[in-house]
């Protein structure tokens, strides 16, 4: 059977051609350095996520439901299938909320790095191939996520499970050595696996979805690449077609979205979170820590706290939650963040878990948030 080639020049074909032909030698020194940092950072976050309830549950599920000897679980020692390891390690890497953060592409490493490590281990690939695959994945999400970011936000759609899946498929395709045609089908097939909403921010603490979405993306990226390698085909218009991703999750396609492909490396632009929790509270955390440099005031003497911020940091309203019911909700809340940092000096997982201590809780209603 002869495969139908991907349509030349459309969005899927252009991204696929770029990824299939990208080499390690094409990358800038900063991109290579940042790739190393991203891998180490993700390993660290996964190590921290491993002993938690969700980390253990994910590891136990992967080894029970997907038994195999293809790849390792981080900090665990047990082995499972490639898909099982990528899924479980991605869940662990996401759980602490300390994964990387790109200004427009969001959190990417928790999806791509566990996938790359699992496939790299299984295929006995070298570090240069892994770095190249990560760069291709980041560039894919850089061509897609900025175009849909605002519409997704309004609709409550989740970036990790959606554009994260598309990026994961390209990273998997590079690691499997797919040619342009197979790469195009990989990306196209992954579009219909992109999923997820952010309802978990309202039901935080009552569900595990936030972290499972990273696992879905890592697993589905591998699945799409394997399907394409086996001969399955995806719709050539998966991105820019009449019912493609750009319109389904955004406002439609504009060729300008692809201008960055081959001209910049999104991986080199990603950053690392100095604090846990939602990155929209981090400016507030930094400002509070700066105030504390002149000495910590007695908490009983505080009568009011004002936070001047920007629209994205206080909308939707879960970001200004004065009555969080659990640690998950507390991690998104500006009033809680400033209260915790005033009391404890930092904003790591163990600090967020102390959100409900009486002297900290007294501060919550004293906070006014405004633009």
Give residue ranges: language-model regions.
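Flexible glycine/proline-rich, aromatic-decorated loop/lid segments
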Residues: 189-198
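Well-ordered alpha-helical segments within folded domains of soluble proteins
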Residues: 109-117, 162-171, 218-223, 283, ...
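Well-ordered alpha-helical scaffold segments within catalytic/enzyme domains
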Residues: 49, 116-123, 169-176, 224-228, ...
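Hydrophobic alpha-helical hairpins/lids featuring a short glycine-rich hinge
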Residues: 90-146
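Structural helix-adjacent loops and short alpha-helical linkers that scaffold large soluble proteins
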Residues: 122-134, 177-184, 233-237
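Terminal-appendage/accessory-domain detector
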Residues: 1-106, 205-219, 226-371
């Amino acid at each position: 059977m002869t495969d139908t080639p991907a349509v030349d020049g459309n969005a899927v074909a252009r991204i696929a051609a770029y990824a299939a032909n990208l080499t390690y030698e094409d990358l800038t020194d900063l991109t290579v350095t940042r790739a190393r940092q991203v891998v180490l950072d993700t390993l660290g976050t996964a190590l921290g996520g491993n002993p938690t309830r969700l980390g253990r549950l994910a590891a136990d599920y992967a080894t029970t439901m997907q038994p195999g000897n293809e790849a390792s679980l981080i900090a665990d020692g047990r082995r499972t299938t490639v898909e099982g390891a990528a899924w479980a390690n991605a869940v662990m890497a996401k759980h602490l909320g300390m994964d990387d953060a790109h200004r427009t592409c969001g959190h990417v490493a928790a999806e791509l790095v566990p996938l790359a490590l699992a496939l790299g281990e299984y295929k006995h690939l070298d570090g240069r191939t892994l770095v190249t695959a990560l760069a291709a994945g980041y560039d894919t999400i850089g061509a897609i996520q900025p175009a849909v970011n605002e519409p997704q936000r309004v609709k409550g759609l989740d970036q990790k499970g959606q554009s994260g899946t598309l990026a994961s498929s390209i990273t998997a395709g590079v690691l499997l050595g797919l040619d342009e045609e197979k790469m195009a089908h990989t990306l196209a097939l992954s579009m219909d696996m992109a999923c997820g909403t952010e309802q978990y921010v309202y039901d935080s603490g009552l569900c595990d979805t936030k972290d499972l979405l990273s696992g879905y993306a890592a697993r589905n990226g591998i699945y799409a690449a394997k399907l394409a390698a086996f001969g399955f085909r995806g719709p050539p218009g998966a991105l820019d077609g009449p019912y493609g991703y750009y319109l389904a999750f955004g406002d439609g396609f504009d060729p300008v979205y692809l201008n960055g492909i081959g001209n910049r490396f999104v991986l080199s632009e990603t950053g690392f979170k100095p604090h846990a929790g939602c990155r929209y509270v981090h400016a507030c955390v930094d400002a509070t820590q700066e105030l504390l440099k002149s000495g910590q005031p007695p908490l009983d003497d505080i009568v009011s706290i004002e936070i001047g911020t920007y629209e994205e940091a206080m909308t939707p309203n879960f970001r200004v939650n004065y009555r969080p019911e659990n640690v998950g909700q507390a991690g998104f809340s500006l009033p809680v963040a400033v209260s915790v940092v005033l009391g404890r000096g930092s904003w790591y997982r163990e600090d967020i878990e102390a959100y409900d201590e009486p002297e900290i809780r007294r501060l919550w209603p004293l906070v006014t948030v405004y633009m």
